[in-house]
């Protein structure tokens, strides 16, 4: 969650448990595409996702000699990167931020439209998640389009969200114990691939354990 005041990045907080997160403002200032200053001068609060591209993940992991110390996936690497105590390390990880929800922007008329909120954020210099405006007739086509595109996406994505554009109507629906009723989330099916085990090598970890490594 990013908060801006007087056009400057004021605070950045992780999602945490949904109620309490960690303040990571110094680290957020090193994110590749987070604007430190924006045109809007009121208080702006937005939510987004921090990610590391697959290409940067492979490069960073390749520089770690200890096999056991390597990260399993870009999400694990990103999670550790945004919570680093040393902001210089965060900067080296090339973390990107994609906005997916505007929480507050006082005095701005969004014409009761979520899409207008996305357009506003883009004008402030933020990269937003990729989206398509759909109707009941075009929804399945759009889902299929994203499903095909996701295989070559440069950053991790675990699903797709259908969100009502009408802000007032969406908020009037309320929420369940865990989720708002104005949106539906889909998860992509797990990727599957067939592999061949050619041989097994043994590798010593930094703690002295001997571990098998599949080749």
Residue ranges and their predicted role:
Residues 1-215:
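RNA/tRNA-interacting regions in translation and RNA-turnover enzymes
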């Amino acid at each position: 969650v990013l908060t801006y005041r007087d056009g400057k990045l004021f605070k950045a907080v992780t999602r945490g448990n949904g109620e309490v997160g960690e303040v990571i403002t110094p680290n957020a200032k090193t994110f590749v595409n987070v604007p430190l200053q924006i045109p809007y001068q009121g208080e702006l609060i937005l939510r987004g996702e921090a990610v590391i591209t697959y290409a940067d993940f492979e490069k960073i992991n390749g520089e770690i000699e200890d096999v056991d110390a390597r990260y399993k996936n870009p999400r694990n690497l990103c999670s550790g990167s945004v919570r680093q105590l040393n902001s210089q390390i965060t900067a080296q990880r090339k973390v990107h931020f994609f906005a997916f929800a505007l929480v507050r922007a006082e005095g701005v008329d969004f014409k009761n439209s979520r899409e207008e909120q996305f357009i506003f954020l883009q004008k402030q210099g933020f990269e937003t998640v990729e989206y398509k405006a759909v109707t009941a007739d075009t929804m399945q086509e759009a889902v299929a389009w994203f499903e095909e595109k996701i295989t070559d996406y440069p950053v991790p994505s675990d699903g797709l969200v259908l969100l009502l554009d009408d802000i007032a109507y969406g908020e009037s629906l309320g929420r369940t114990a865990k989720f708002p009723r104005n949106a539906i989330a889909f998860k992509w099916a797990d990727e599957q691939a067939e592999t061949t085990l050619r041989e097994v090598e043994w590798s010593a970890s930094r703690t002295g354990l001997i571990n098998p490594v599949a080749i």
